[in-house]
């Protein structure tokens, strides 16, 4: 399967990522599928398989990002089997094993603060990794907590365009290539397109694939 920029495809990211050139992306900005959104169950074997899936993804991210580019993973942890499945710590470990460094870290509040939930946290961990990239620390980027007004499409939370713009504008320049391999309805890709960046992304599930970004052009209130 071929790879071309400015493309949002319906398909398996792992069929395309290996075809992407080394060090081609300025920004990989994504939220990998949650355990509940995969084929893996909550058994010890299932969780190990899920973590291998996460590791496989981060190895590709670390390969395709430029030396001065960034990998941004924004994901929540989960309560599973009476303990915490610390997704953000596992992603950090995997990226650091690839030689990347944690350049910045923020909390992204995705629900109202203080909401009570048995299984889901109300915030996401935003990890910003790079090999040698630099960030201009000024203005809004200095905040360490970002309150995002997210919407739901079925069981998937959708980042606001304000949040996507915030990350892309602070970490890339015009003409940069922004990649979201687990694009969902495509908020990162739509933001990149509007901001004059190149983009590439994939979504496996028909129920989330937002062909030609139609939901952003019409009904999705993000």
Predicted regions and their residues:
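Short intrinsically disordered terminal tails
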Residues: 1-2, 220-222
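Core catalytic lobe of class I
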Residues: 1-209
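Conserved phosphoryl-transfer catalytic core
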Residues: 217
